[in-house]
């Protein structure tokens, strides 16, 4: 997966927490359908034009995503599996998931047949600048940043989702630190201090790295790398650059 290339709801079996965090998140109080959020992060220090909040028709956030073209969003498959385009809305390019940016309906959903990645085609192009998909995720030690509106406390359903986007600086770690990872197609990402990382509500959201002064997309939040309590273990992200051929075959070159 690179030189060593690095949820929306509880799964019935706690062991694979985060990884189905989209459809099951309805159990969380006060934020129906919310996926992992970032535990131990801080309020976003800038507006990320490409940041997407996937929402139901009532405006409830359930997953994150990344704008990769003016009318295409990449997210986790478990976020949109079983959903119809008519049931999905996207708020794009704001740090507040309830206001600002562009608010657009989904027109089509494409699920990858084997891994936890999906594409959402928007009903209309938006003016926000998309993020470039990186050439590769990078080796162990690559500095990255996570973004999301997921739960900010580690226990499932223990708190609501923040209104303001959260960010967390972290790094790629060895695949062996993530249980159940598909190393050639996924990224194992550190949980700094053993207490900070993605949580319920963050699923589908971006893992990004800085390249020549600009953010590039390397990952989409997928699941925990071990355990149902958020941030106590490294977490797993789909390696988006690996799926460039699949993405380009549907959305056009990226």
Language-model features, listed with the residues they occupy:
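Structural detector of coil-to-beta-strand junctions
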Residues: 49-53, 130, 187, 206
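Acidic glycine-/aspartate-rich tracts in secreted/extracellular proteins
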Residues: 58, 78-82, 93-98, 123-127, ...
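C-terminal subregion of chymotrypsin/trypsin-like serine protease catalytic domains
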Residues: 2-9, 23-30, 67-77, 167, ...
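Chymotrypsin/trypsin-fold serine protease catalytic domain
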Residues: 100-107, 117, 121-195, 233, ...
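A conserved glycine-rich beta-strand in the N-terminal activation segment of trypsin-fold
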Residues: 49-70, 101
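N-terminal activation segment of mature serine protease catalytic domains
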Residues: 29-56
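Bacterial N-terminal signal peptides
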Residues: 11-20
